[in-house]
Amino acid sequence: MRMANRIGAGRKSALQLSHLRTRLTSSAAAVATAPTLDPAPVPAPAAAPREWLVLFPDMPNVLDRRLEIRPRHSPNFVRLHKEQWVTWAGPIFEKHTFPGNPRRPFKGSVMVVNDVSKEQIWERLKSDPYIQERIWDLDNARVIPFVTNMRRTPKK
C-alpha cells in the first residue's frame, strides 16, 4: 500500500509540475506580447556650472597700457565676483614686490570661474577691456577644469 501511495504521490507531483510549467509559459507569453508603455523621454539635466582655472599671460610690453586700462577692467571683475561667476581672481607677477608699488611687475592674470563650458567662459570674457585692448595674450591663455578642495584665508 505504501508503494501505491508513493506512485500516486509521484504522479500528483508530476501533474502539479506540468500545470505550473503551463501557467508560467502562458504568463511569460502574455508578458512578452503585452503592449509596452513607452515612457516620455527624460530630458538630460541642465549642465551645472563647474570650476575652471583661467590663466591669462600678458602680451609683451603692455605694462603702461595695462595700468591705463585697469580702471575699466577692475569694475567688470568686481561685478562678475558679486554675481558669483568669478570665485577669486588676481594678477600674476614676475616677482613679489612691496605693497602699493605702482609699477608692480605684472605678467598676467589668474582666476577661478564657475561655468558649464570653455565656450561659455570665452563668451563671457570677450567683453573685458583686457581682451578688447589686447593686454592678455589669448593665444597662450589656458582654461583648465579645476576643483577647489580647500580654501582658507591666511592669518595676518
Curated annotation (Swiss-Prot):
The keyword Transport does not apply. Pathway: Secondary metabolite biosynthesis. Induction: Expression is positively regulated by the aspercryptin cluser-specific transcription factor atnN. Residues 1-39 form the signal peptide. The keyword Signal applies. InterPro entries: Dimeric_a/b-barrel (IPR011008), Sec-metab_biosynth-assoc (IPR051807). Disruption phenotype: Decreases the production of aspercryptin by more than 80% but increases the titer of aspercryptin with Ile replaced by Val more than six-fold. Keywords: Signal. PANTHER family: PROTEIN YCII (PTHR33606:SF3). Part of the gene cluster that mediates the biosynthesis of aspercryptins, linear lipopeptides built from six amino acids including 2 highly unusual and nonproteogenic amino acids, 2-amino-octanoic acid (2aoa) and 2-amino-dodecanol (2adol). The core structure of aspercryptins is as follows: Ser/Ala-Thr-Ile/Val-2aoa-Aasn-2adol. The first step of aspercryptin biosynthesis is the generation of the fatty acid precursors, octanoic and dodecanoic acids, by the FAS subunits atnF and atnM. The fatty acid precursors are likely transformed into the corresponding alpha-amino fatty acids in three steps. Belongs to the YciI family. This is Aspercryptin biosynthesis cluster protein B. It comes from Emericella nidulans (strain FGSC A4 / ATCC 38163 / CBS 112.46 / NRRL 194 / M139).
